[in-house]
Structures are given as structure tokens and as C-alpha cells.
């Protein structure tokens, strides 16, 4: 290969790796009765004056009414700020995000879940991550579409569920039912993320961690996750045939750590975005918040601090590199692509000889278009002349590593 070609490859790779997607802003939902009953899954509430009477929130009650901007202002938070600085059952999560350098907001009980609506100052397009901790109100068709478009276009969605029969506002729907309805009953794509929540209720501390050395959720900046503590939670079933990107990272005790059932924590990709899901809200509970609720610290003391590690590593994974490449920060780069954008043919050049592996090309929905086994090739030629213009993802998996890069087809 000529030096000129090597330089071109380096320039192209560098350009794509530095494109920014958006500010690092995280939105915590408070519009789906997250503070109903004995829950208080908000990062901060200055007022406690709403109630849930078999449905949405209404003024007249004692539940947390989270405002858009937490107070005191997050600019005053330091590395030593305690979680009681804000008043909410998941304030520690929010304050940890601020300490990491993120900006956090709450979507109030009367806020709107939209995508691409410029008149909404809290439109999801303004955020990198959307956290929904145990929703208790069904999403509307329009809200489902907005959330799926948010993920498709590079956003990160953190889905927190709870055990079956945990309807807190008395409307007949619990978080397991609501999340499954979101994924299976929408106008965009059925089961887009490749998993569903089971209707279970169990408690355990599990050390059944998937063996994935490069996984950011398990081995991220907050440390190595060695266990997780559930107190009344549920598990998930995976469907890799629907979305090959889905992966269980923590499993129920006694289950296979590589299987498709009994997953306690899951990650997936959809379009350019990412999804993280956990089957219990108690790991996020920091034990302080609404004085009318009985809260327990699962965030710091749960599983000897591992609950916090898992949640913050997952938040970091969702927030980082949600850019136009759509590639995880922890994936090992195994190859270069030339040219990119491409018109007729792509050349994939592995950095080292790949004795055994797989090359795949997928569209923006994660649907596999091309798959080829690799056996020592020094380069791969891919004809893209018949593909529609747009964004695609080229991946090479080899010896336990997977590298993915975005390509653009432009005829």
C-alpha cells in the first residue's frame, strides 16, 4: 500500500472520530409518575404538592414535583458535595452526573416528550441521554415515536424497570407493562432493541457477570462491576435474532452468563444510538428524598457499591461518543476503510492479519446486509453500488473483539 493511501486513510479516520453529536446534557424524566406511591425517582424537587389519583399527576397532594432545573444550581456542586444537596430519591445519580461534567435537567410532570419540535425547550434533540426510572403511565404513540427517533439519531436511552405488579399510581399499568408496550406497540418498529421485560418479582445479590473484558458498563470509569443487588426486581429476555446488538451484561444467579434469558442488565444499539436497561429501580435509590416515602439506600451501599458502578458506567456509556460515527468508545479499532464516503466499492484494510473472524455490513436499523467469514485476508472489497444512499455500519469481529465503523454511501 502506498504512503499516500495510508495518509488518506488516517485523515479520513481522524475526521470522523472528532465529529461531535451534541452537548452532554442528561434529561431525567418526571412526567410518568416516577414519584407515585412509595417511589421518589426524581433528582430534585423543591415542591411536594402533586398527587396521583388513578392516573396522571394533579396539583393537590404531597408527592415530589420535580422542577426543570435542580437547586441549588449544579454550578455550585463540587467533588465533595453530598447527595442530600438535592431532594430526590435518585439525587445521588444526578449529582454524580454533574461531578462527571454532565448537565442534568428534569422533565416535569407536565412536560412534553418530543423529538424535533423546536418550540419545546426540552425536546429530546437537546440531550444526549434520556433517563426514565420506572415509568407508571403509558407512553402515547407520539411519545413512543419521539423516543425511538431520539435513539435512532444517536441518543442514549436508560430504561429502568421494576418487578411485576408494581403499579404505583393505580391506573392498571406497571413499569414492566409500560416498557413492553413501548417496544412492541409503536408505529416505528416492533421490538427495536431486541429484548423484553419479564413479569417477575424477586430479590437477590447476583455475581453472575458476563465475561466481556472490553465492556464499558462492566469495566468503565467507575470501576469493575462484580455484583448487583436487586430488591424486588425483574429480568429480561433477549432476542438477538431481532437485534444482533443486544447483549446481557449481568444475569440472575444460576443462569448462563451468555444466554438469552434471566438478564438483569442489558445493553443494545438501535440506529446511531444506544440503550441500557436494568430490571429494578432499587439500585438507583439513594435512601433520601420525599419525607413521605420510605426509601432505602441501594445506590451506594447496595452490592458494596457495585450498584452505583453499574449505573454510572452505563450512563457514561450512553453519554459518550453518541456522535456521527455511532461507535462505542471502548471498541478496539481493527481496520480502516477507504474511500469513505463511497460510491461503488469499499476497501476494508485490517491493521493486522485476521486469522479467523467475521465481516458484516448493516444498515441504520441494524439489519445485516452483508456477512462474510474472514480467513487471513489482508483486505476486503465490498461492492456498494446497489445500496441506497445513506449511513451503514461495517463491523469486524475477531478473537473476542469487535470493531465497528460508520460508512456513507453516496452515489
Question: Predicted regions span which residues?
Answer:
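Active-site-proximal beta-strand/loop segments in catalytic clefts of secreted hydrolases
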Residues: 29-32, 107-111, 132-136, 160-165, ...
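An acidic, glycine-rich "communication" segment
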Residues: 62-64, 68, 163-261, 267-270
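Helical hinge/lid and interdomain linker segments adjacent to catalytic or ligand-binding clefts
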Residues: 74-180, 185
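C-terminal outer-membrane/trafficking sorting elements
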Residues: 330-411
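Extracellular ligand-binding/catalytic regions of CAZymes and related secreted enzymes
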Residues: 23-84, 99-100, 189, 256-335
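Hydrophobic/aromatic beta-strand patches that form the interior of the parallel beta-sheet core
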Residues: 27, 105, 158, 191, ...
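Residue-level detector of buried hydrophobic side-chain packing
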Residues: 97, 130, 154-157, 266-268, ...
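Bacterial Sec-dependent N-terminal signal peptides
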Residues: 1-24, 367
